[in-house]
């Protein structure tokens, strides 16, 4: 279904990946705390740097040591002008997507009441609107920040905080705005955490929490345009679990799952389904979900017939940490210390010489120097412990606290 056309080595393990909504830009957040943005070739042969087969040069737009610990999550703003990053150091930073220059810092609320309380590491970040971001954490909190409120030299409190889960929030998916919405932005969000899903209204709080599903729920994506009939509205939430099974949830019936699709079948349980992404309508037939697994494979599941129709391998050792599609419809997969770009496979009448020429045309691009001249950290060069994926296994004990206090911080200088 897809052919790999280039591979991009990274300096350390990938923890987060974000794809620009309108430009061929990919941002990565690394275990070292670095954030780096790449410009990939245009998907057509009319743009600068493109070649006849869609290949060209991958350039580093900017690179910096953004966080003093691992970068846990990334997200572009609605208009793509801002890149938000959140790190295990307890900071959220907003930077210009084009240059990487930071223009806003926010402290993630800590656990406890003292000045030395534990950091509550972030897990997922999303831009709700140009003025608002939503951030989830390891403790199961959901923080809403209004960026129009100028940050204080002392603290920046979230405008609202909800607690949809007792375990860490593993995914965060918006529900489509209602037909009566005047803003056009999502007000209700579905989260997965531990063994449940929850629906939270950002104005009214947690609306509903599902029954215990007896397995860890890892990832989610919302799909519209499915066949409606009977009680089905043609809209479903697709959730990836830790045992290789996708569950489908009917909109409005959030107490329990509606259907199950076995994606990875193994005698002792399948691989964890780490990340889900919906294929663009221009690719394939019907609604197809790309499923990134913990074993480095990406499987493609067609909804309706509810079966796996294709598979590619990103890496044979490291799991998938990032997966999505750029403005040109190319799939971008990330995991371990490599990012790969994939084009939709094209059926060819001939083989042999032409196919061999195409294989030789595929290139491996190596990024530039690790030297970072645009470091916004005051403790540059501090040695970081290399950390593996942030995923926790079901049943691991966690310290819980209801206290939501904000870490004080100085100005942007």
UniProtKB/Swiss-Prot annotation:
Composition bias type Low complexity, residue spans: 170-183
Keywords, comma-separated and alphabetical: Nucleus, Repeat, WD repeat
Disulphide connectivity of cysteines: none
Cell compartments where the protein resides: Nucleus, Nucleolus
Signal peptide start and end residues: none
WD repeats by residue range: 9-48, 66-105, 114-155, 218-259, 268-311, 315-352
GO cellular component, one term: nucleolus
Region (Disordered): 150-187, 348-413
Keyword Repeat part of the UniProt annotation: yes
Top-level division of the source organism's lineage: Eukaryota
Compositionally biased intervals (Basic residues): 384-397
Main location: nucleus
Keyword Lyase: no
Regions of compositional bias (Acidic residues) in chain numbering: 369-378
The family this protein is said to belong to: Belongs to the WD repeat WDR55 family.
Name of the featured protein: WD repeat-containing protein JIP5
Native source species: Ajellomyces capsulatus (strain NAm1 / WU24) (Darling's disease fungus)
